[in-house]
Amino acid sequence: MDLSGSLLIAMPSMADPRFERSLVLICAHSPDGAMGLVVNKPVEDLSFAGMLEQLNIPRAPNGRDIRVHLGGPMERGRGFVLHSPDYMSVGATMLVSGKFGMTATVDILEALARGQGPSSALMALGYSGWGPGQLEAEVQRNDWLTAEAPSELVFSDDDPGKWTGMLRHMGIDPLTLSSTAGHA
């Protein structure tokens, strides 16, 4: 099972409070483990413009402003830009299922600061990581629902509504979603 490009939707029974009502886009998944970015938990006290200022990256008057999210509990000082596939930095951009790109170099920050770069993007500080078999076990334990990731929802500005919106997109009423599940 390769979940690359899939969206993990935290179940109401999620035991880890860091992932409560989280949506995680899986960027890489292999027998060695998985890596993903939470796409609906904005960092409240840091704007993209503020981050550019901290990094001494000049922002043009037409510079883009993207949302900064907490991508997960791992390496929170490291930044990743999840973006539409219309931007590629040779040797630095990882394509995720053809619908997304992920770039973790200063080039994309500079492009966005100049008003260039991908048509859609969000910044993530840190990432979510799983060791070999760990994510599969969490899915089997019903910690997560999995679904194809709609790019319009991933890049939506409605961070508080993304979790509910994704469930509705799947035809699930969040009010009737049980916090326990069984196996047939």
UniProtKB/Swiss-Prot annotation:
Give the family from UniProt.
Belongs to the UPF0301 (AlgH) family.
Its lineage opens with: Bacteria, Pseudomonadati, Pseudomonadota, Alphaproteobacteria, Rhodobacterales
Provide the species name. Cereibacter sphaeroides (strain ATCC 17023 / DSM 158 / JCM 6121 / CCUG 31486 / LMG 2827 / NBRC 12203 / NCIMB 8253 / ATH 2.4.1.) (Rhodobacter sphaeroides)
Q: Which domain of life is it from?
A: Bacteria
SUPFAM superfamilies the UniProt entry points to: VC0467-like
Per the UniProt entry, the signal peptide is: none
Recorded hits in InterPro entries, A to Z, give: AlgH-like (IPR003774)
Q: What is this protein called?
A: UPF0301 protein RHOS4_26140
Gene Ontology cellular-component terms for this entry are: cytosol
